[in-house]
Amino acid sequence: MKKLYRRLLDICYENKLHHLGSYFSCLHIIDEIYRTKNEDDIFILSNGHAVVALYVVLEKYYGLDAQELLDKYGEHPKRNELDRIHCSTGSLGMGICVAVGRAVGNPNRHVHVMISDGESNEGSVWEALRYINDSGLKNITVHVNANGWAAYDPVNIMLLEQRMRAFCPGRLKFHRTTVNYFGLDNSLHAHYTNFTEEQYKEAIASL
């Protein structure tokens, strides 16, 4: 993980990227998915604003250059199966719906999808969770990156987990994470800032 964090740090600093809290809070989850999934399984990042974390994981496991992916696709994923990007996302709540469709369309292929806690404000997320449960869909896993922050406000993680497990008890993995990485505040500031030179050097030194 140390090399992944360093790679993500470098790209974020060199490109003056925001959404740092989203990137760093989900990096270890995406890495674990790719480390353990079957080769044929697919991954969809529904909270597309965290895509730079996906880019560095794709670099690790498939040799794709993370900086080139950022230059090519930008800060939200655009579907290109050749580059292992299985869904264009950005508008929150849409990726999980596509993931459900992919799982229904091919029962022999497992689909992993990540959503964020802030994304749970979208009604389509709850429709998808209910459909997964009511239809008995088995070849999908919904990973929730619960870092405690939505776009404008904190999220009640305990209440959110209770509600989500009530909707979809069988296919949910709820990951309680934090945005407090490398000196970032555990606040909205972690989502809407970029690294200064001083912060970057301190972050590198802490690895």
Regions found by a protein language model. Name each.
Residues 78-207:
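Glycine-rich ThDP/TPP pyrophosphate-binding loop and its adjacent helix/strand module
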Residues 2-17, 145:
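N-terminal capping segment at the start of a domain
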Residues 8-9, 22-31, 197, 202-207:
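Phosphate/pyrophosphate-binding active-site segments
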Residues 1-2, 197:
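Short, structured coil/loop segments at alpha-helix boundaries
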Residues 11-135:
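Cofactor-binding active-site loop characterized by glycine-rich and histidine/acidic residues
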